Regions:
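Surface-exposed, interaction-prone regions used to assemble/regulate multi-protein complexes
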Residues: 1-99
């Protein structure tokens, strides 16, 4: 699975504070300790794994998106589409990344 260098650069060092579903099976929101949020459009209801940790890297292949966390964990999400499914906003709601 290839590294998503751009998204890795945006998220590296942020700690996962919580994960919740977007209503009506429209996606997942990963909240970080700095108040920023990663929103991922998913195909229907996605399982919500209970993982925490600091983002080390992000990998992506097709519709599979993996956040590699420290010390040793991976948050794997299935996106709705290979592109146009991921967005990151900072604590003020300013767009930092969109794909």
């Amino acid at each position: 699975m290839a590294s998503n260098r751009k998204l890795s650069g945006v998220l590296k060092g942020r700690s996962v504070a919580g994960i919740h579903a977007v209503p009506a099976g429209r996606g997942v929101v990963v909240g970080f300790d700095d108040g920023s949020q990663l929103t991922v459009k998913t195909a229907g209801d996605a399982p919500l794994p209970a993982v925490t940790g600091r983002v080390r890297a992000v990998r992506q292949s097709g519709t599979t998106l993996c956040l590699d966390l420290e010390p040793v964990a991976t948050l794997q999400l299935e996106t709705l589409e290979p592109t146009a499914s991921v967005m990151v906003r900072d604590a003020r709601g300013v767009l930092e990344y969109a794909d």
